[in-house]
From Swiss-Prot:
Signal peptide: none annotated. One of its GO terms (biological process) is translation. SUPFAM superfamilies: Ribosomal L11/L12e N-terminal domain, Ribosomal protein L11, C-terminal domain. It holds the Pfam family Ribosomal_L11_N. Belongs to the universal ribosomal protein uL11 family. This is Large ribosomal subunit protein uL11. It comes from Kocuria rhizophila (strain ATCC 9341 / DSM 348 / NBRC 103217 / DC2201). Forms part of the ribosomal stalk which helps the ribosome interact with GTP-bound translation factors. Part of the ribosomal stalk of the 50S ribosomal subunit. Interacts with L10 and the large rRNA to form the base of the stalk. L10 forms an elongated spine to which L12 dimers bind in a sequential fashion forming a multimeric L10(L12)X complex. One or more lysine residues are methylated. NCBIfam families: L11_bact.
Length: 143
């Protein structure tokens, strides 16, 4: 007989600095209200994202009724990767009038390669278009 499936009690989505999860907000309160062992999650997340230090890594945590959990890490947000490539601290407040930086199409393709698994695109060209659109809406020129 197949083992019974665990019942899902909740789904938590967070964006945490890679390798730097700790019980302080926002991690602690989000997990605490679902009864998850916070330190256990922090240790597992930090171990899983150690290689990506310096990036913000989104994570989807599935909490089960027996208070156990599983999590899936995603690729860093496109906006974060674009800001790093353009060398700017933040996007423009008025993106269509004030440009804050420039990135090349090669950089856009590189970011698209990184993000491809999380994007809703069939090929790398479609993924590059999505990334270029995000860059433009941040006030960053794409050449």
């Amino acid at each position: 007989m197949a083992p019974k499936k665990k019942k899902v009690a909740g789904l938590i989505k967070l964006q945490i600095q890679a390798g730097a999860a700790n019980p302080a907000p926002p991690v602690g309160p989000a997990l605490g209200q679902h009864g998850v062992n916070i330190m256990e999650f922090c240790k597992a997340y930090n171990a899983a994202t150690e290689s990506q230090r310096g990036n913000i890594v989104p994570v989807e945590i599935t909490v089960y009724e027996d208070r156990s959990f599983s999590f899936i890490t995603k690729t860093p947000p496109a906006a974060q990767l674009i800001k790093k490539a353009a060398g700017v601290a933040k996007g423009s407040g008025v993106p269509h009038t004030t440009k804050v930086g420039k990135i090349t199409m090669d950089q856009v393709r590189e970011i698209a390669e990184t993000k491809k698994e999380d994007l809703n695109a069939n090929d790398i060209d479609a993924a590059a278009k999505i990334i270029a659109g995000t860059a433009r809406s941040m006030g960053i020129e794409v050449n």
